[in-house]
Design a protein with these regions (language model features):
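Surface-exposed short loop/turn segments
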Residues: 114-170, 184-185
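Alpha-helix termination/capping residues and helix-transition junctions
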Residues: 30, 58, 127-130
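C-terminal/domain-edge helix-coil "capping" segments
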Residues: 36-61, 163-230
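Bacterial N-terminal signal peptides that target proteins for export
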Residues: 4-23
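Bacterial N-terminal signal peptides
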Residues: 20-32
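A mature extracytoplasmic/lumenal domain signature
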Residues: 68-70, 105-106, 137-140, 158-162, ...
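N-terminal segment of the mature soluble domain
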Residues: 63-135, 170, 199, 204-213, ...
C-alpha cells in the first residue's frame, strides 16, 4: 500500500467503508436488473459470510432411521417417499460426522410387517435398533399449476424422535413447511419435462429439510432461482 493510501485509510476509514458498501449495493442492484443473480450471490457471500448452523445437531455418532410417509404411503412404499428418504439420507451422510443410517431395505421390511397406515415411529425405531428416527410426513404434493406451469407444492411435518434419551423416547426436534411453493410464480411447463422439474424441486425440498441437521449456505435460494432463470 502506498503512503497516500495509508494516510487515506487512517483519516477516512468510516467513509471508505460506506463507499465500499454503497458501491457493492449499487452494483448488486444493477446486476439484479440484468438477471445475473449468481453475481449477487458472490457479493453477499463476501459481505456476510456463508454458513448458518444447524438447528438440530444431535445426529453425530448415532444410528438413524429415516422414514417418509406421503398421501399414497398407506398402500405401501411409493416413489415419492423413496426419493425423499434417499435425498435427505445422502445429505446427512455427506455432512454429519460418523452418522450411521439404517438401510431403507431394513426400514421398509419393518414397515411392511407392521403396516404403513398409522405408523408408530417409536416402535419402528426400536424395531430397527435406531438411536434416532427422522419421520417425514408429506402431503399436498404437486408439481403443476394449471396446465401450463410447473410449480412445486408440498406440506411437510418432520419430527425427530430420540430413542436413547435418559427419560425414554422423546421428541427432540420438529420442523414444518406449510404450503411450501417453488418457484413462487411458477415456470412455463414448456421449458422442462415433468421429470426434470420434479427432480429439481425434490432436490431443493430435501435440501431444505437437511438444513435442519447440517450447516448450510445462507444464499442457496439465489442459486436455485438463477438455475431456473427466475
Amino acid at each position: 500500500m502506498s503512503p497516500f493510501q495509508e494516510t487515506f485509510m487512517r483519516k477516512f476509514p468510516c467513509e471508505l467503508g460506506k463507499i465500499v458498501v454503497l458501491g457493492l449495493v449499487a452494483a448488486s442492484l444493477v446486476i439484479s436488473f440484468s438477471g445475473c443473480l449468481p453475481m449477487i450471490d458472490r457479493f453477499l457471500y463476501v459481505m456476510k459470510g456463508s454458513e448458518i448452523p444447524a438447528p438440530y445437531n444431535k445426529l453425530t455418532n448415532k444410528r438413524v432411521a429415516i422414514v417418509c410417509v406421503s398421501d399414497a404411503s398407506a398402500y405401501g412404499p411409493d416413489n415419492l417417499s423413496d426419493s425423499v428418504t434417499r435425498l435427505v439420507g445422502a445429505a446427512l451422510l455427506a455432512k454429519v460426522k460418523k452418522i450411521q443410517l439404517v438401510s431403507r431395505t431394513e426400514v421398509d421390511k419393518w414397515v411392511d410387517e407392521n403396516g404403513w397406515d398409522n405408523m408408530d415411529y417409536i416402535s419402528l425405531g426400536k424395531g430397527v435398533k435406531a438411536d434416532r428416527v427422522i419421520a417425514i410426513e408429506l402431503s399436498g404434493y404437486s408439481i403443476h399449476e394449471g396446465k401450463t406451469l410447473h410449480k412445486g407444492k408440498a406440506n411437510v411435518v418432520m419430527t425427530v424422535y430420540e430413542l436413547d434419551h435418559a427419560k425414554g423416547p422423546v421428541v427432540g426436534h420438529t420442523y414444518q413447511l406449510k404450503e411450501y411453493e417453488f418457484p413462487k410464480n411458477g415456470r412455463p411447463a414448456i421449458q422442462s419435462t415433468d421429470r426434470q422439474f420434479e427432480e429439481f424441486f425434490l432436490a431443493r425440498l430435501c435440501r431444505l429439510l437437511s438444513h435442519q441437521f447440517v450447516k448450510h449456505d445462507r444464499f442457496d435460494s439465489f442459486a436455485d432461482e438463477a438455475i431456473l432463470g427466475m
